[in-house]
Amino acid sequence: GQGDAVHACDALTGNCTDYHAYFIALARSLGIPARFAIGAAIPSERHDGGTDGYHCWAEFWVDGIGWVPVDASEADKHPELADYYFGSLTADRVAFTQGRDLTLVPPQQGPPLNFFIYPYAELDGVPFDGVTRSFAFEDV
């Protein structure tokens, strides 16, 4: 997914980026500040190895509390945990970045990044896609 709320509505399906683009659009339409967050889930039963890729969630602002996480895609997969995922995330999450349409520091010459989870490189100002995209972890 690309985090496109209109696509998610039209297709009636999507991955976590689409679910949370839709949630963020709904929250903002009601005047509730909301933002996109992305990272990975580290399997708690293992002490090292790789993980399958990224996972994202949304956060919305509540005065007096701050940013509250929501994981609508996990709640959809596990309806019995829907209440939990509206305000909590599992402890195995590692957050990488927040926001969309990102400009890096120093700024990339290419367009803003839809979201930033994988290594990004440019050759002569052109995005280079030949970068290895994998995640590995180990207990320290």
Regions found by a protein language model. Give the residues of each.
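Short, conserved helix/loop micro-motifs enriched in His/Cys and acidic residues
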Residues: G1-G14
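Hydrophobic/aromatic-rich core segments of domains that either
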Residues: A21-Q109
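N-terminal accessory/pre-domain segments preceding catalytic cores
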Residues: G64-V68, F96-V140
